[in-house]
């Protein structure tokens, strides 16, 4: 005799486009990106943040300028400056903040990521 078991259906994947701010792009970071874009002389540039394998903790953050926005990219605009994130990277960055800090030890873009279980001392790699 066989018994049919009804399995629960998977919840639909969250639609990050409908979330108000899945990622925070600080005013300080936007100001620095604006300055760098002006130095490049190309007003069509946006800052792309992405995640890739590597680093001492398993994943690392990457930053690059990009003129092209893919249809499924998340675009966060702060003070007229655009930050782009692809959907695969966004799953690791949900709720994170992209900021820019200056201190006696130097200036850098910083990602404060609530999803990171551990980070390394350099601040550019993490694990989940």
Curated annotation (Swiss-Prot):
One of its GO terms (cellular component) is cytosol. It comes from the Bacteria. Pfam families: Fe-S_biosyn (PF01521). InterPro entries: FeS_biogenesis (IPR000361), FeS_cluster_insertion (IPR016092), FeS_cluster_insertion_CS (IPR017870), FeS_cluster_insertion_RrpA (IPR023063), HesB-like_dom_sf (IPR035903). The keyword Calcium does not apply. Keywords: Iron, Iron-sulfur, Metal-binding. Its cofactor is iron-sulfur cluster. Iron-sulfur cluster binds at residues 56, 120, 122. GO terms for biological process: iron-sulfur cluster assembly. Binds 1 iron-sulfur cluster per subunit. One of its GO terms (molecular function) is 4 iron, 4 sulfur cluster binding. Homodimer. Belongs to the HesB/IscA family. Required for insertion of 4Fe-4S clusters for at least IspG. This is Iron-sulfur cluster insertion protein ErpA. The gene is erpA.
């Amino acid at each position: 005799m066989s018994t049919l078991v009804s399995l629960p259906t998977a919840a639909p994947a969250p639609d990050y486009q409908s979330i108000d701010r899945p990622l925070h792009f600080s005013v300080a970071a936007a100001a620095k990106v604006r300055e760098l874009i002006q130095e490049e002389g190309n007003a069509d540039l946006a800052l792309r943040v992405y995640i890739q394998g590597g680093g001492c903790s398993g994943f690392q953050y990457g930053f690059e300028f990009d003129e092209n926005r893919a249809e499924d990219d998340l675009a966060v605009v702060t003070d007229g400056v655009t930050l782009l994130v692809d959907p695969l990277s966004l799953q690791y960055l949900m709720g994170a903040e992209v900021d820019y800090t200056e201190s006696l030890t130097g200036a850098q873009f910083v990602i404060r990521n609530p999803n990171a279980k551990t980070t390394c001392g350099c601040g550019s790699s993490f694990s989940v």
